[in-house]
A protein has these predicted regions:
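Non-heme di-metal
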Residues: 1-198
């Protein structure tokens, strides 16, 4: 939870920068995804709010940046990449590719995280709702992100195809590097957090 807090406590925000930088079907698809991320306009249903609830249910500080000193650079690189893509209009294709890959690959891990919390005796909605919501929402977002967002962007602006692929591959590479870092640390009986965690 601490490792992912830098991402999930502001999850949708960098992608919102792309809304005015897209047009047509791709823009509509991104707005549809973002509307879900922001809870359909209801703060208690915002995904960042749900993640904060999960953190608090586990006794963690849910304020943004509370653990940034414990999060390794390989995990922060994902957050920085999203922000960089979102802040530069010329990288809008890369941001779309990053988001599409994230949505395509998040349902199964979120199901596992939720089930893991339940196995640990944390079968309380405030602990698992974020993960359960992502299983449901991202199952829908998969098709929207792949076809309506990335597919439409490439159809309408073929010159951005390489950027979309770059964004997806960058997300995949950083996810892989983060996973390798964690497995290596855990295999030696160490925390994935810097300074051994709290």
């Amino acid at each position: 939870m601490i490792l992912r807090s830098a991402y999930h406590l502001k999850e949708a925000d960098p992608h919102s920068f792309a809304i005015p930088r897209l047009r047509g079907r791709a823009k509509a698809a991104l707005v549809e995804i973002q509307a879900d991320e922001y809870g359909g306009g209801r703060e208690p249903r915002m995904h960042a709010t749900l993640f904060a609830q999960s953190m608090r249910a586990l006794g963690l500080d849910a304020s943004y940046g509370a653990y940034v000193g414990l999060v390794p650079g390989v995990a922060l690189a994902i957050v920085n990449m999203m922000s960089m893509f979102g802040l530069h209009r010329r990288l809008r294709g890369a941001l779309v590719g990053q988001l599409a890959l994230f949505e395509l690959t998040s349902t199964l891990p979120n199901r596992r995280y939720g089930n893991g919390l339940r196995r640990l005796g944390l079968d309380r909605p405030e602990a698992t709702r974020f993960f359960d919501e992502h299983v449901e929402a991202d199952a829908v977002h998969e098709a929207i992100a792949a076809n309506d967002l990335a597919g439409s962007l490439v159809d309408d602006e073929p010159a951005l195809a390489a950027d979309v692929v770059f964004g997806a591959r960058a997300q995949q590479l950083l996810d892989q590097r983060c996973s390798e870092y964690l497995v290596e640390r855990w295999s030696r009986g160490r925390s994935g957090l810097l300074r051994g965690g709290r």
